[in-house]
UniProtKB/Swiss-Prot annotation:
GO terms for biological process: D-methionine transmembrane transport; methionine import across plasma membrane. The lineage of its organism: Bacteria, Bacillati, Bacillota, Bacilli, Bacillales. The keyword Phosphoprotein does not apply. It is found in: Cell membrane. This is Uncharacterized lipoprotein YhcJ.
Length: 276
């Protein structure tokens, strides 16, 4: 009986030591995200827990703050920005950040309750576009793709109305918050998810869809350059770029987001081209 009690006590100590040892603890990773991506990252977080990682999701509404927080080591990674935005922002503010891998592309379309076709848009029509800098730039490109205006050479996906070279219909661009997009405008340039929130019917009110499906508009997971090879972050990237994650995105977002997993080699080639 005494031997049994001693063995039991030793076993309890071993179990307690194992449970409390650093090797058994989950590594904590803080990731800054856009609130609209919560469903995806909750899915990733569940998978990460099985891999021994504890993902803490930090929502940001100001995208610039997310990059600054990453540079200041307040978070370990962020996932919200396109390649073109990342290039422009990090170059402007000299941040030592690096892309880890790509996630998805968000289509952007042209919608209207007043017009049925692009060619029907009248001279002087008011066009609402997103007020966030990089979405504003995307909207300009969508309008150019539709033949409604021409942008200056050197346009890199971000910028202001100063980048417009020709506006033959004299469209009046109105930069607004998403919730105000359909107020006082004839035409709206926005993402499908925003169009639905604004009460638009994609089948009835879409004049042009699927704009900006290029590599430069893929969204990224971004980390500090020194952490690019960090094992935990590489694991998170693998979990994100898995087939089951792509299937989840397609089912959950119904075309509002399109999975786009760029191989790391191609991302490195792009990064080298950007740096040189």
């Amino acid at each position: 009986m005494k031997k049994w009690l001693i063995c039991s006590f030793v076993l309890v100590l071993l179990v307690s030591f194992t449970a409390c040892s650093p090797s058994a603890e989950h590594e904590s990773i803080k990731i800054g995200i856009a609130e609209s991506d919560g469903a995806i990252w909750n899915y990733i977080a569940q998978k990460a827990e099985e891999a021994g990682l504890d993902i803490q999701l930090i929502p940001f509404s100001d995208y610039a703050e997310s990059d600054i927080a990453l540079a200041n080591k307040e978070i370990d990674a962020n996932a919200f920005q396109t390649i073109s935005y990342f290039q422009s922002f990090t170059e402007k503010y000299k941040l030592n950040l690096a892309p880890l891998g790509t996630t998805y592309i968000t289509p952007m379309g042209i919608y209207s309750k007043r017009y049925e076709r692009i060619r029907d848009i009248s001279r002087g029509a008011v066009v609402s576009v997103p007020d966030k800098a990089f979405d504003f730039g995307r909207a300009l490109t969508v309008l150019q793709e539709a033949g409604l205006l021409t942008l200056k050479n050197g346009f890199n996906g971000t910028g202001s109305v100063d980048m417009i070279k020709d506006n033959p219909r004299h469209l009046k661009l109105k930069a607004v918050r998403q919730q105000d997009a359909v107020s006082g405008a004839d035409v709206f340039v926005m993402k499908p998810s925003e169009a639905k929130k604004a009460g638009l019917n994609p089948k009835k009110h879409t004049l042009k869809s699927g704009g900006l499906m290029s590599e430069e508009e893929m969204n990224l997971i971004v980390v500090r350059a020194e952490d690019q090879d960090r094992e935990a972050l590489q694991t998170i990237l693998e979990l994100y770029q898995a087939d089951d994650t792509a299937a989840f995105i397609e089912k959950e977002y119904q075309g509002d987001l399109v999975p786009a997993f760029l191989p790391l080699k191609r991302l490195s080639d792009w990064k080298n081209e950007f740096e040189h």
